[in-house]
């Protein structure tokens, strides 16, 4: 009986853990959304375009399996906890 109970507890924990998903803020809606399996990083990418002096930097938020590579004139930060990439203006 103890073995059956222990088995049920382990199965329950495994099933609950599978149901949990990693979430990040994503643009354009700037809302928290689940990431695809294997994407366990959130990123924030900012840069200036030709309208930067009028509206500020362009901001891209999303999920990634690895931190996006550096790009000229773009600031990229990554983090590894749920919703750790809020919009800088919020």
Curated annotation (Swiss-Prot):
GO terms for cellular component: extracellular region. Its main location: secreted. Pfam families: Toxin_cobra-type. Keywords: Acetylcholine receptor inhibiting toxin, Disulfide bond, Ion channel impairing toxin, Neurotoxin, Postsynaptic neurotoxin, Secreted, Signal, Toxin. GO terms for molecular function: acetylcholine receptor inhibitor activity; ion channel regulator activity; toxin activity. Disulfide bonds join 24-42, 35-63, 48-52, 67-78, 79-84. The keyword RNA-binding does not apply. Expressed by the venom gland. Residues 1-21 form the signal peptide. It is found in: Secreted. Binds with high affinity to muscular (alpha-1/CHRNA1) and neuronal (alpha-7/CHRNA7) nicotinic acetylcholine receptor (nAChR) and inhibits acetylcholine from binding to the receptor, thereby impairing neuromuscular and neuronal transmission. Belongs to the three-finger toxin family. Long-chain subfamily. Type II alpha-neurotoxin sub-subfamily. This is Long neurotoxin 1. The lineage of its organism: Eukaryota, Metazoa, Chordata, Craniata, Vertebrata.
């Amino acid at each position: 009986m103890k073995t059956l109970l222990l088995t049920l507890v382990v199965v329950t924990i495994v099933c609950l853990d599978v149901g949990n998903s990693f979430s990040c803020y994503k643009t354009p809606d700037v809302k928290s959304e689940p990431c695809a399996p294997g994407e366990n990083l959130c990123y924030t990418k900012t840069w200036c375009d030709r309208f930067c002096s009028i509206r500020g930097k362009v901001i891209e938020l999303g999920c990634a399996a690895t931190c996006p590579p550096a790009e000229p004139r773009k600031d990229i930060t990554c983090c590894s906890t749920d919703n750790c990439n809020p919009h800088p203006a919020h």
